[in-house]
Amino acid sequence: MITVAPFVSLRFQFPLYIINRSTLFFRERTQYLVYNTCHILRTTAKTMPVVAEYAKSNRSSCRSCSNKIAVKSLRLGLISKGRGGVDMTRWHHFDCFPTDSESIASVDDIQGLSALEKEDQDALTKLVEQCGKVPAKKPDEKKGKAKKHIMGPKGLTKAATSSKVIADNAKSSRSSCNRCSQTIVSKDLRVGLVTEDSRGFDITRWHHLGCFPIDFHPIDSVEDIGGYSSLEKGDQMELKYLAEVNKKDKTLIDDVQKMDEGDDEAIADNELTEETKKGKHSPVAKLVEQPGEPAKEDEDEESKKPASDEISEQKTKDVKNSPDSSKVISEYAKSSRSTCKKCSQTIAAKELRLGLVTRNFRGFDMKQWHHLGCFPVDSDPIVSVEDIGGFSELQSGDQDALKELVQQCGKQTLVDKMDEDNDDTEAKIKLTEETNKRKHSEVGEMVEEDESLTKAKQQMAKTHKVNMSESTSQVEVEAEITLSASDVKDKYRDANLLPKWKAFETVIFLERDDGLNDSEKIAAFDFDGCLAKTSVKIVGADAWSLMYPSIPEKLQSLHDQGYKLVIFTNESNIDRWKNKRQAAVDSKIGRLNSFIERVKVPIQVFIACGVSSSGGKGGKDDLYRKPKAGMWQLMKKHFNSGIAIDMDKSFYVGDAAGRKMDHSDADIKFAQASGLKFFTPEEYFIPSSTSPGT
């Protein structure tokens, strides 16, 4: 009787069958297997075992494409025997697995299948069905161009029959829009285009609702959208509107299709013609025309405009002229990805932001986010806080800030314009001069001091680095500030202060930093937005970064030249946040301490904690809050050892200069009121700028 037993060779890389006769014997030696005379039959190569799992790290590489396999992504491995009988696994991406050369008899042969998620198990089942099939050959581009498909955004084909549309609320913030490449925020409505690749697997391309290519993938009815019934009523209404817009815009879509059916040169010519026509009829082109110059377009050209252009223009006019075309919403930024429409700066996460919601000509809502101080109250006034969406969900301090903003609507903008009319400027100058005279008589100042202030005004107007007229620079008459030892406190209201920090009235100050020397030359700076990047809504001593890399070197150079460095900064949140005052104090002082430690230069600091009178409560402006010169006068009279200050050599640097993108003009007016030369941070800290101390 002959017994056939399978045997795995340690010497050879193929399976063996050993036919055992009565005379057959074998024994094992090191590294070799010795057989006596027997019949050894070689069989066909056995398929290598396949294992599937989620990558434990990102160190493995795909055997096919050589790219890294991301952690927690599905990977497939082919297990083979290496030298010495050690198992070796060759990992592949799921899409890179060689189905044409490696066959899998059944999905049950895949090791680790039961540990995978249901969706991945279904994908592997389809993969097993594809194993052994020869992939379709790609058309040879050299022999001739393949038949062109009408393409949409980012390569989406126009064939609606090969794709379907689904909609849901994003489960996380990991998905991104296929059209604009921006992240789709968690729980936001997203619309997916599901297509099938060459191997039969479904691929979903997600879009924002406003980014969905409705022109290339029309939606005839909401019943065609998968997952529609599970959405909230508001999201269902938006999808219904999307379907209605699709029906109304069929004429425009047909025009696009006809244009795309031509060859590349015809398409380019058509696009150039359309752009030329749009340029002629655009409002910008009309503004370029010189006054009195006759229009170049005649009635014949106007009558030749396509019907689609007329429809688009009519929709745009209807939206712009509609009284309810915009609304205001408020919320805390969910991330740091949004930017302010006015200043183009990033809106930090958890910071209060105001959104102006407008509707475009296709009926989609467009949100334009702004910082609180950048919101255009002059062009988009807010009648009442009840008109602000999300107002009730804000904290009490932010609700008070919005109430102040509403009261400013219709009166003035948050950012005063530098190009005011000459009549208004002269009126303000006269009013300021009369006020200064009254203050001067009340405090009984000497005539000589008034003359010195006039000289300081003239000197500041000559050396001012910002483009402003001489008539706008007014030095504020010094107020009587009396200070005694009993007036200095170790606490600010109910908040404790860190060591070396004291409080006087509405000012918190660091009088004597280690190594600080009083001087006739003062180099004064704002803190937030000038020396450090900070956010009001993010508290913490470490929640800041240097505004410019050259700051430590610049400050050290000024200290070496005998300047005393002083920081004058406003922080009204310390007064406004009654329930969180201690946190506000610790955050502000902690940041300043960290900054001083970072630059390694002794600095004197004054923090104005008072609130301005713009809140509508009828109170007066805080004496020490910029643009008032109270902090400068306090330092000059009581914290400079009686040394007279040389105004020609002293200066102030701040970011609130009243420019178009600045949040206010408090710094430039503070410099004017104090009689100091003024620089913006860009002028002073950028190496190409000319500034004192360089």
Curated annotation (Swiss-Prot):
Biased composition (Polar residues): 322-331
Family classification: In the C-terminal section; belongs to the DNA 3' phosphatase family.
Compositional bias segments (type: Basic and acidic residues): 302-321
Classification via CDD domains: HAD_PNP (cd01625)
Intracellular or extracellular location(s): Nucleus, Nucleoplasm
NCBIfam families according to UniProt: DNA-3'-Pase (TIGR01664), HAD-SF-IIIA (TIGR01662)
Entry GO terms, CC: nucleoplasm
SMART domains, sorted: zf-PARP
Name the UniProt record assigns to this protein: Polynucleotide 3'-phosphatase ZDP
Binding site for Zn(2+) 2: 177, 180, 208, 211
Organism from which the protein derives: Arabidopsis thaliana (Mouse-ear cress)
Main location: nucleus
PROSITE patterns listed in its UniProt record: ZF_PARP_2
Record GO terms (molecular function): DNA binding; polynucleotide 3'-phosphatase activity; zinc ion binding
Subunit structure: Interacts with ROS1 (via the central region). Binds to XRCC1.
